[in-house]
Amino acid sequence: MTELITLAAATPMFEVTDKVLVFSAAFCAIALAAVGSAWGTGAAASSAIGAWKKCYAQNKPAPFQLMIFAGCPLSQTIYGMILMFSIMGAELTKPGIWIFYMITGVLSGIAIGISALWQGRACAAACDAFSETGKGFANQMVVICIIETVAIFVMAFSMVLLSSFAK
């Protein structure tokens, strides 16, 4: 914040406005990714809790692996954070360039967030299946990681786009 105040005193208005809008774009990247992570972890955690309840009711041991499933969608927040830092490092070479960063931040954040949401749904199904059978953990993780790959691709391609645009 102090950086923006100092910047405002020494630069023309459009540069300050552009910088504020780029920082807003950066926040969109992490915020939208985090919304998806929250939704996904909520779905997976709810399923894990229900599966543990079934295990306790049947006097079966509660599998720890369900905690792994419940936490999987959190990684998309990290991808949003990495993208946020990439956008914050933007060089504002021309007035109005902020729109490029805003579109990248918003669309990337949405895509990463949707990946987390669907990963959470898959993790919820994995919790149910694994708690009942005690089998298939590796296969379930592979399928869950396929969904994760979408978020990694979005982050990587967005960063390539950001770096090529800055040239």
Residue ranges and their predicted role:
Residues T2-K167:
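Hydrophobic, small-residue-rich transmembrane alpha-helices and their short perimembrane loops
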